[in-house]
Amino acid sequence: MSTIHQVNEMNSRVGEKPACCIGAARGHCTAHCPRIEDVLYSQRKGKTNKGAQRWRCKACGTKWTSKGIIIQPPVVPDTIVNSIGFGNGPEEISMEQLRANARPYKKTKTGDNILQTSPFPSLFGNSIGMGLGGNNNNINNNNNSNGSNSSNNSHNGGSSPSGSPIPSPPSPVSFLQRNSNVFVPILPQSNGNNINNNNNNNSNSNSNNINSNSSNSMQLQNNNNNNGQLRSSSSSLSLSSSSSQLNSSSNGNGSSRNLLTSQKSAQSLIGNINNNNNNNNIINNNSNNNTNNNNNIMNGTTTSTTKPVVVGGPMQILNSVVNNSPTSSKPILSSSSQNLLYNSSGSIPQPSQSPQNNNNTTINNNNNTTNNNNNNNNSNNNNNSNNNNNNSNNNNINNVANGTPRPSLQTSRLQGKLPSPQQYNTSPSHQQYPSPKNNNNSNNIIPIQSTYGQPTPPPTKPPVSSKAPAVYHNVRVPSPNTTVDNNNNNNNNNNNNNNNNNNNNNNNNNNNSNNNNNSNNNNNNINNNNNNNNNSNNNNNGNSNNNNNNNSNYQQQHQYFSPNQNYIQQQVQAVQTQQAQHILAQQQAQAQQQYIQQLQLQQQTLAHAQSQAAHQAQTLTHSRHNDLLSPIDSQIWAPIQYSWIQTHYNPSSSLLECLKRLINSVVVFSNELPVDQRLKMINFLTTLSSPSSESQYNTNASKQMLNCIDNSVFNITKHYQMLYQSISKHYSMMEDSFIPLTEVYFDENEINKFIHFSDQFKIIEEQFEFILRELSSIRDTLIIKRENIEKNIIESSKFLNNSSNNDNGIEEIGLEQAKQDTTRLLESLAPLETTLNSMEIKFKSIQKEISMVIRVFSFFELLYNIHINCHQTIVEKHSRQLSTYMIDVIQQSLYNCDVISVAYNRLKTGLFNSNNNNNNNNNNNNNNNEEDDQLIDTTNPFINKLSDLLSKYENISKNNNNNNNNNNNNNNNNNNNNNNNNNNNNNNRNRDRDREFERDNNSNNNNNNIEKERNRNNRIRDRDNMDIDNISSFISNNQQQHIGQSQSVQQSSQLPKERKVMALYHTTCLDHLVPDDHPESPKRLSSVIKAINDFSRQSDRLIIKNDPEEINDKWILTVHSPEYLRLLEDLTEKLDANEIRPLNVNNDGASTGINQFSTSTPITTTGTATVTPGSTTSSTNGEQCEDGDTFVSKLSLHAAKRSAGATCQAIDNVMKGNVTSAFVAARPPGHHAGRDGLTSGTSSQGFCLLNHVCIGAKYAQLKYNLDKIAIIDFDVHHGNGTEEILSNDQGFYFLSIHMFEEGFYPGSGGGVGSIGVVNLNEFNEQNDYDDDDNNNDVNNNNNNNNNNNNNNNNNNNNKNNNNNNSNSITQQSTITNNSNCKGNIVNIPLDPKSSASSFLKAFSIIIDKLNDYQPELILISCGFDAHMEDHLASLCLLEENYVEITRSLRRVADRWCKGRLVSILEGGYNINALRQCTIAHLSALSEDD
């Protein structure tokens, strides 16, 4: 479809070629220039290579050979969104490129006699360009450019002429693409000023006179139809006014005078109808739906050596019936069919005709009737030329393709009357199709200037699929000023008496011209009879026109009549010379009255505009696309109900193109398809791309299939390509990291658009089902045809057998008689043999078509199965990806919100304190409010939302603190009551302790308020204490509270169906280099990987994942500070590939750790600095120590990120239920790494860089909204980094069991000053009560000094339990309380050389506390360095002990966490022991109880 700028560009170009051929590929437009000429190449330059045949187009001069098959370039799947004919695809090229690629025009001897043609082509092959030329020569040019000359009717479209030396040439492939220089009418268009210009400029045109011949003959034939004189009147009336014009218009290709004089066999009104050249032309023009009947007179027979062929379209079938062969049929029509046929060149009028055009219409109709009353054929012809011009302004809203009108939106449902005859008299060359804006002014479409300066409308292009319905969007209501009512003819007959004189003069001139011809008497008689007929039928003119409304437009293509053509030719010669002068004079007189009459018509055509739409619905009752149009509203101006139908329907040029579009739109999702379907689809794509497919899919059955399925295929193709476009756009947005924070792409509208694809699933399925039904119907039809042919062949063979049997039964007679009988028999069987051969040919062709239909059916069946099985999967998969992306964005926003809120509170607190210092107490509040207002710009449109957010955040924090205080007070009160009851039974020593406990309780509230204020002021520094749970609950609209204990027991007790364990590791972790004698060597990980592989061969429950991705930095920053992460990045980037360096030491030995700026050194109670056994030196008085234990290399940070990524991936698989538990072989370890790397009181990070278990815990908390996560650390070293990060965060519960002694790294988790310590006092049952009581007194004294409610309660419980002489492990354990105690930390230190039984008894405390906590997820810092063979510690555990430890934790996970447990490797430095412990750990995780 040409664009506006293409049409405007053509206006400035006046070329020898038609405009459609200039824009077509290879310089030839098969749609508009179907007339081609056979030229044997041997007649010029000898034969071509391998006997190729050559043809040229007589309209544009383009040549091609039979071997030069044009193959349309295939659509590349990568250009998926722009490749199906909607939008701007790669085939949308500019006009300059088209002209550069077009084949240059070269004149030949045949074309030298052709005058320069107008760039405007007709719509169809047999039509003549009407109203374009300024003289008779211009008419001939229109004939040449539009492919209808005097030899047009000598042959049909597909047969070879008797004198042609070669068969019909193959027509070049029709490139009906959008880049051609014509456009398909999609929307209804207003009457442009081009048609007005045609009417105005054609006052001196003889082409209008030719048009008038057909229309005049048509009207008089309608009149004569009532009188019963069909053929004589039609022939006589069609001849009288066009003879002079025909002789002058056929100068280029041979004189029609010679043709006409050679055919003078008619002697009467009825006469012989053997020569049906003009009749055939009339039928051909009518079959083209919008061609004018003047072609009937214009076309004649010639004996030229060239062969006319009509290329493409359904007209070949019609022309094969109506040809010039002696055996062609001459059907006799009924009166009603004649009336329809004689008014069958029109179409539905276009909206908003100009008044001038309607005025022309009025005068034309008036002149028709008055001229009939005056018995003047010349005047009738002149007036009918204007009538044709008027009817050409009435555009058909439907697209027209190769003679068959395309149905409009309302044709499938409306059933009404036929349109008036005016709408059938439209010349296709006068049609004008809409501009995008559907305006009436001439600025929208600038007319193309022809050779003779006549303005012409832009070239139009019919769609290929003649029956496929056009899908329109937002079609507007046609203007009521477009159609002349039937009653207007009668009204106008009374207003045209002024032209009678001219008509009489024309009649006299015609009589004079007839006297100069050979058959004067016959002409005069015919004129007299014709005049009488005209007089008798003028009274019925209006009624006959009204009767035409009862016939359908579709029937006009199949109505034939056979006037006496020889008699017509004689009459044409008689009036040829003088007719043109009178026609020109009369047109000038008529032009003056048109404008006045047209104003009157505008008020009369309002009612007829909508009735005409109902008439047009009758035209396509045989269309197979009515069910496709059912979803669309019956009114033509109603919008499309389905939003996925965009703009317009762009038909495919061939079935092959249609199939390629569809498969290319689905093949982009091949990765989502099963293997067998993917291979089948690739095979189909390969088959369709082969060169032989062009001929295989170019049959009658393929055209029929294309007409049936093209619309549905277009909708399916468009759906899949829009789906691919949407998904691609989403991916690009998700991968774009530079989207501003203020821009939210995935809003509600975008998600609704994507969800709409899922809603269309059923609609596309129905489209597929419709296509399969249509293909099944076509296949069944072909099978029936094949069976009929087989039946006929069998019957013929029976006849042959019977004949032979009869011959054998005849008695022997004389030899001469036998010869005669044999000769007669052979002569009688010769036609039968010919019939059988033709039937065999038809049988083979039908068999090929059946196989082709079956292939297409299997193709659509495959795509239908793909749609059913994979469409929803594709949509759901992308939906999950969108959900994951949105969750990540929300979680990151939550973290940012929390950080910003803390900073805001800190800023507001700082301003509040400064105001208190600078101002009086009376002005403090006012100043504080003013400062608060100045923190945020008041012009910010989000200030209200931000203020609400901050106030809600403060309220949540206050409420949580108040709730915590209330809970503590309630617990204290309950403990007090219990203790009071127990203390009543104690001695005086216990009473003193109760008094101290009461004093402690009284001071608890003050201590809590002080600690609350201190935490609020230091919130920005202690970022690890941020309560992200509070922010998460706020953003998610206060999600549900913690589940009660009884409910959680029932829910969490659901065990997985099948236990699966995943082991994760990455070989990049081996690239973390350390010195050769370092205990944390890569050999450790190699040993663990070997153990994993060995265990996988023994158990089918282990799943190995060896390619985890690196973790995103945003999750690292939830645990570690940005400064520390930047330090690691800078340090590792500066190192060479094999360089190893201590973490906190420069080349000059200076400390570079993040804590080097700290001025505080942890001091023990004795005033000495804490000794760090893991460091090379100890420090006092604030001096920092270098880390001689932890080393880094070039890839150390990447290895740590891989380990952290493996941890998060393990959590994902466990939380999603893919596996029940997971083991991560992490290296380097991580539980000693604090927020800034080094923890307080240490100068070494204990081989650790990133704290994997803390990163995983934060990841699970934020991503899966978990409220209770337990972290158990049974490494021999205390997890000081994990404790520092998770302390005081109530969403986590950290429990560590480890060895503790002075000088043993890290020196925390058991000494004085440690938090949450549980001391195990092993004693004998024979120890008396007093010794135990004294021990408890010491603990109680320490507890009274530390003012902690929870620890005091526990101590009192332990004290009372000791008074009751309990002997269990839990009764022997007490928690050491101090001022730094955190309620979510439990440390169980063990003495060196502790036995395995002591370790297991102490570990039972952890199990009991886990059951009380009821976690939702369990994470394990799994260290195997407490093994007996590991020399970094002195504990004595064996492999079976680790099995028992792991089994007990797995049981807790099965009880409370649905089996969700993730274990991360920490320590373990003996290679053999590490391997054995890994296998023991995996076996305990994978076993069932």
Swiss-Prot record:
GO CC entries: cytoplasm; histone deacetylase complex
Top enzyme class: hydrolase
InterPro entries per UniProt: HDAC_PDAC, His_deacetylse_dom, His_deacetylse_dom_sf, Ureohydrolase_dom_sf
Compositional bias annotation for Basic and acidic residues: 989-1001, 1010-1024
Keywords: Chromatin regulator, Cytoplasm, Hydrolase, Nucleus, Repressor, Transcription, Transcription regulation
Principal place of residence: nucleus
Regions of compositional bias (Acidic residues) in chain numbering: 1325-1335
EC number: 3.5.1.98
Record field: compositional bias (Low complexity): 135-163, 190-259, 281-306, 325-399, 431-450, 486-553, 915-928, 959-988, 1158-1180, 1336-1367
Record keyword Repressor present: yes
Disulfide bonds: none
UniProt key word Transcription: yes
Any one Gene Ontology molecular-function term assigned to this protein's record: histone deacetylase activity
Biased composition (Polar residues): 400-430
Source organism superkingdom: Eukaryota
Function per UniProt: Responsible for the deacetylation of lysine residues on the N-terminal part of the core histones (H2A, H2B, H3 and H4). Histone deacetylation plays an important role in transcriptional regulation, cell cycle progression and developmental events. Histone deacetylases act via the formation of large multiprotein complexes.
Family note: Belongs to the histone deacetylase family. HD type 2 subfamily.
Name this protein carries in UniProt: Type-2 histone deacetylase 1
Annotated organism of origin: Dictyostelium discoideum (Social amoeba)
Source taxonomy: Eukaryota, Amoebozoa, Evosea, Eumycetozoa, Dictyostelia
